Amino acid sequence: MTPSAPSQPVRVAALYRFARLDAFEALRAPLAAFCCGRGIKGTLLLAHEGINGTVAGSEEAIAELIDHIEAIDGLAGLEVKFSSATDMPFHRMKVRLKREIVTMGVEDIDPATSAGTYVAPADWNALISEPGTIVIDTRNTYEVSIGTFKGAVDPATASFREFPAWVEAHRAELEGRKVAMFCTGGIRCEKATAYVKSLGFEDVFHLKGGILKYLEEVPAEQSLWQGECFVFDERVSVSHGLAEGDAELCRACRHPLTASELTSPRYAAGVSCPHCFDARTDEDRQRYAERQRQVELAQARGKRPHIGS
């Protein structure tokens, strides 16, 4: 990746807002032009239910983008988490139109009007430490594998679409309990609370700003977070204070890897890792090895490798 100038670190903004956008299609081209004109890269998703995305650029450009989005009818009060990166973590800018800004696949769920109760990061420890509270990680299992809250339940989902089925299967376990949910930036758990409330549960809570806001605001010595938080860009993970983490990504299967997994005999950079080794053939590994060789050659020539990110 192309290094950023030391005097201008890259500003990363993870943002979302559930709001009724009847003419969301018309926002696509102007938003893309606005971002591209300021060197902003990343992805923004637009749907009838609102906006979601992560973008990066100079501090000035990101501030201008947030102001621009909040000036759009219905999008004031955008939920934003800021962090920094030493290099630009995205390859290009994309603005996409979707059926949902976070895909659950359940009709008639409206987080804008029926989400659970927000819990500020400063109050989160007290809630999840209460006897009888069930704490649910609404992220996918590959994200959970490198970090989660102490005592949290992992539904072991491969995608957010599987979450409603998990809730239905464990409905009896939730009865009569406080249900506290969390996710990376707040969007999935906010939608999850709306779904759980639609089933008749009342004591439903979610971490405002998600794990990212918690790691930003809660000191490490007081934290109940264990491990690192997976993020969907080239940083791979962040830790307390939103410092870039130590996790790396298997370029063969896209699974995040901890430091111990990187020492596994089944790990080869760009070729395989403990999570995908058994699922690959020798032919697959030979193909990935050749791709990795090309990546390393490009890096040696000072070029920026691109392998689909």
From Swiss-Prot:
Residues 129-223 form the Rhodanese domain. Residues 288-309 are annotated as: Disordered. Its EC number is 1.14.-.-. The active site is at 183 (cysteine persulfide intermediate). It holds the Pfam family UPF0176_N. SUPFAM superfamilies: Rhodanese/Cell cycle control phosphatase. It catalyses: uridine(34) in tRNA + AH2 + O2 = 5-hydroxyuridine(34) in tRNA + A + H2O. It comes from the Bacteria. GO terms for biological process: tRNA modification. The keyword tRNA processing applies. It is an enzyme of class 1 (oxidoreductase). GO terms for molecular function: oxidoreductase activity, acting on paired donors, with incorporation or reduction of molecular oxygen. The keyword NAD does not apply. Keywords: Oxidoreductase, tRNA processing. Belongs to the TrhO family. Catalyzes oxygen-dependent 5-hydroxyuridine (ho5U) modification at position 34 in tRNAs. PANTHER family: RHODANESE-LIKE DOMAIN-CONTAINING PROTEIN 7-RELATED, THIOSULFATE SULFURTRANSFERASE/RHODANESE-LIKE DOMAIN-CONTAINING PROTEIN 2. This is tRNA uridine(34) hydroxylase. It comes from Mesorhizobium japonicum (strain LMG 29417 / CECT 9101 / MAFF 303099) (Mesorhizobium loti (strain MAFF 303099)).
